[in-house]
Every structure is written in structure tokens, then in C-alpha cells.
Design a protein with these regions (language model features):
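Conserved N-terminal segment of class I S-adenosyl-L-methionine
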Residues: 1-114, 137, 164-195, 199-213
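A short glycine-rich, Lys/Arg-flanked "PGG" loop and its adjoining helix->strand segment in the class I
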Residues: 134-148
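Conserved class I S-adenosyl-L-methionine
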Residues: 149-171
Length: 213
């Protein structure tokens, strides 16, 4: 299943292709490498509580809630019918979902959590969609006391791959909703201003970082 999701405020939140549940063998191979690196970095962070910003339909937060047992896991995302439908299907006793206030069209407002409320704050395939990624990362760092775990598409590779498969030619291969584009080096530079980049992984075609605060 795929499509373009637009929030109630008219914000394109991206292509909603279900990469975690895809039956395509190529996608499955790419996602296996992605999830392996993600699991390894999550284990290195060893959190007892997690905030996932832009949690989507709840695939990852449900997994993390099961892994943490009684540890608190909170997923937050925009109000959108398909997202909340996913939340209804993915529940756990220690898992909580919150609807994010979109605020003005040019930025995402402050996260509704206290300073150092979580061990880990994550944004997995999210920062490319937000109008002000610097503000979003700053808010994540405020809410987390130990680590950030983040991933984004690696550019210009991502757009080149889109064009190679004949997708989004009119946008030069840019996926709908992708407002920001980072090479591995430029993404490391962005996150380095918020903490020590402890691990950098490059599962094709993404960049994934674990940042120590």
C-alpha cells in the first residue's frame, strides 16, 4: 500500500508506502539491513524509556515497548486517520500515543514533554519531512537525557534511485513531502551540534546516527 498523506493543516507528511510490511524482495532485503542496524543502535543506547517523534502507524514503538517490558514508550505524530488507525491496532501496556500539534505551517511546535523526561528520543525517517529540523532536533535533545537515535534518506543517492525506477521525474526524484536533503556528512554535522555522534551507520540508502547527549 502506498500514497501521499496530507495532514489536516495541508502539510504533506510524505509517501506512506509500507516499507516494513512490503512483500517486494528488494525492499525486504534493504529493510533487513536497515532494521539490523537500527536494532544494534537501540541496544547500544539501552534505554529504559523512549520517545519516538513521528512514530507513524506505530510499528517501531510497539516493537520497542515489547522489548522494554515495563519501560515507558511514547509515540507522537500528527493527527491523520491512517496513523491513528495503526495506533488502534498496535497496543502495549507500556505504550502511549500522543497527537502532535502541527502549529504554524512553517514549523512544528515544541514537544509536550518535560526536560530529560526520556532516556532516548528517536526520529526514524522523519526529519526530512519537518519544516524546521534544527528546532525539532533541539526539542528532542531537550526531552532526552542520554541519547538521540535518528535516520534519514541519504542524498543525492535517494533521488537518483527514485529516478532510476522512473519515479517523481517532475520533482527530479524527490519523494513527496521531503523538504530536507542531507548527505551522510551534512547530517552528521547537523547532529554534532547537539551531542557526540557515537555511531554512524549507512544501511543502503539511508544514514543512521546514535548521538550521546
Amino acid at each position: 500500500m502506498s500514497g501521499v498523506t496530507v495532514s489536516g493543516d495541508g502539510i504533506v507528511t510524505g509517501n506512506t508506502y509500507d516499507k516494513y510490511g512490503s512483500s517486494n524482495p528488494v525492499v525486504r532485503r534493504l529493510m533487513a539491513a536497515f532494521e539490523r542496524d537500527l536494532d544494534e543502535l537501540f541496544d547500544l543506547a539501552a534505554p529504559s524509556s523512549v520517545l519516538d517523534v513521528g512514530c507513524g502507524e506505530g510499528v517501531l514503538v510497539q516493537r520497542w515497548a515489547e522489548r522494554l517490558g515495563e519501560g515507558r514508550v511514547v509515540g507522537i505524530d500528527l493527527e491523520e486517520e491512517s496513523i491513528q488507525a495503526g495506533w488502534a491496532e498496535r497496543q502495549a501496556p507500556n505504550l502511549e500515543y500522543r497527537v502532535m500539534e502541527a502549529g504554524r505551517a512553517d514549523r512544528v511546535e515544541n514537544l509536550p514533554f518535560a526536560e530529560d523526561e526520556f532516556d532516548l528520543a528517536s526520529a526514524i525517517e522523519v526529519l526530512e519531512h519537518v519544516p524546521d529540523p534544527e528546532h525539532t532536533v533541539s526539542e528532542m535533545a531537550r526531552c532526552a537525557r542520554r541519547h538521540l537515535l535518528v535516520s534519514v534518506p541519504r542524498e543525492p543517492l535517494w533521488r537518483m534511485l527514485n529516478m532510476a525506477r522512473g519515479a517523481y521525474w517532475s520533482a527530479l526524484g524527490n519523494t513527496p513531502g521531503h523538504l530536507n536533503h542531507w548527505s551522510r556528512r551534512s547530517f552528521v554535522k547537523l547532529l554534532s551540534s547537539h551531542g557526540d555522534v557515537a555511531e554512524v551507520r549507512s544501511p543502503f540508502p539511508w544514514t543512521m546516527l546514535l548521538v550521546r547527549l
